[in-house]
Amino acid sequence: KNNLKIEARTDKNNKRYYFIRIAEPIQAKKISFGIGRDYSGLRVITVSEISFYNYDSLEDDIMGLYEDELHTVLKGSVTEQTIQDLRNRLQTKDEASGEYHPDKDRLEKELDNAEDILNNQLSEPILVHNTITTRDTDRGFSGLNAWQPLGITAAAGEEITLFVGHNTMGTGSNTNLQLVATQYHAESGSVSKVVTTLKTGRNDVTIPKIWSTDEESGGALYIQYTGNNANDRYSVRVNGGVEVPTLDLYGVTDAQERQQRAEQYVEALKGYVEKMEAVHKKVHENSGNESVEYEYSKENCILGATDILLDKMLFSLPAQQVLSGCEGNAQKLLDSMDAMEGMMNLFYQHKGLNQTAPDEKDRFPQRHLNIRYQRMFA
């Protein structure tokens, strides 16, 4: 039983059938099918046709293009010719049956996904934390969200492409991930918008304009997990926008790893902030996108958006101010973050919450308090 995967499918005539996949090729003289029915006896299952297919390594070869099980990173040896050779095999009918591969449509999507990844300049994969979710229990206070930074800032009207991978779902499947667009240096009523619910594989998205203020429009992008499954493993890569340094310390308890991540982040910030005005002139002033065709302003340029993700807090701040505040010192930054986490512990304990409480509503929230760089009320 553990070596079988049974999928209920529907053909082009809306007739249901079942696709049975055996984990590994077998040699057999006899195969037995046991077909039952429910206890009511009203629904009789009948079988009009059974098709058997010879083993073909094509599916394994296509899945073998990827470095990771989430299908967002290709192996270094993959070329356009590698993908084309597999596509040619997929377009060839089986000699014995005279039919194409029974999973031809799904495998074509996998090849399209691999080709897209190969031909695009993508950001590094972001692994989604499945313990930060919108399905968190309501505890009677607001100000929390389930946003996870993608390390990308994008202008309103800009078209970007996101590639989503999952540990079990095939390309084109619906996910529990939403893309959230935000406005940098926003007013209180125009901070964010859920743009779309993503599918596995390629997602082409246009970033919406969130406000009408005569300043640059756009900001940091986030993923929001809406599920509640500990086995969900998602990875996201982005083509488009501008990569911005971010620091993810969520769930990181090892002191050495925290130090290393903080040092890498601060070094990345130094190089990024130094070049920010030049990048603005290149990708904003000369972009042809009126949403960002403004003279450089360090207060309003959306390139300034950086995020620091902690266990209970998400900081969304100007990159220049983070660098200035820590004076380019990773240890000073870590000390500040540790102090904030300690304050959040006291804050939640004051509300009667306890991380080890038996009832979820009495535990610390899974969502984050988000401190953002925003405009003061007029």
Regions flagged by a language model, labelled:
Residues 1-2, 12-57:
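Aromatic, loop-rich ligand-recognition surfaces of beta-strand-rich domains
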Residues 2-22, 190-208:
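Extracellular carbohydrate recognition and processing domains
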Residues 16, 27-29, 41-48, 158, ...:
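Residues that flank catalytic or metal-binding motifs in active/ligand-binding sites
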Residues 19, 32, 161-163, 222, ...:
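Beta-strand secondary-structure signal
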Residues 40-58, 227-298, 303:
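Exposed low-complexity, polar/acidic, P/S/T/G-rich flexible segments that act as propeptides
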Residues 57-119:
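Beta-rich interaction/scaffold domains
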Residues 116-258:
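Beta-strand-enriched, solvent-exposed domains that form extended recognition/catalytic surfaces
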Residues 282-378:
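Catalytic cores of extracellular degradative/oxidative enzymes
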